[in-house]
């Protein structure tokens, strides 16, 4: 499994890393996956620091500030709420599609 955050304008995004940390934490706790990379360790630490209050934790992030200026606080809160959908995209022939299984 490769987790790749999209970032913003070719730059690191804190919320992408926290999301990757949440996914990595779930996968690794299943004991079906292993990781020996420092990036997954760092992402998991960020996730565990933020998981009790994503909205507050990301208050200083550049992306949240940008979206707040666009009056999108409600959207931000929705995006920071885990397990909002059961749809999982998959990659097929260089396209993202909805999983059929």
What residue ranges belong to the model's regions?
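Long, charged alpha-helical interface segments
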Residues: 14-101
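Short, structured patches in soluble enzyme cores that scaffold and shape functional sites
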Residues: 3-7
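Short gly/pro/ser/thr-enriched loop/turn and capping motifs at secondary-structure boundaries
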Residues: 9-11
């Amino acid at each position: 499994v490769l987790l790749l955050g999209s970032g913003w304008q070719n730059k690191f995004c804190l919320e992408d890393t926290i999301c990757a940390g949440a996914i990595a934490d779930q996968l690794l706790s299943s004991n079906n996956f292993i990781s020996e990379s420092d990036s997954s360790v760092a992402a998991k630490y960020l996730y565990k620091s933020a998981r009790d209050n994503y909205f507050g934790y990301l208050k200083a992030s550049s992306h949240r500030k940008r979206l707040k200026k666009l009056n999108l606080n409600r959207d931000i809160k929705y995006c920071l709420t885990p397990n909002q959908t059961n749809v999982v995209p998959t990659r097929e022939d260089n396209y993202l599609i909805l999983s059929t299984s």
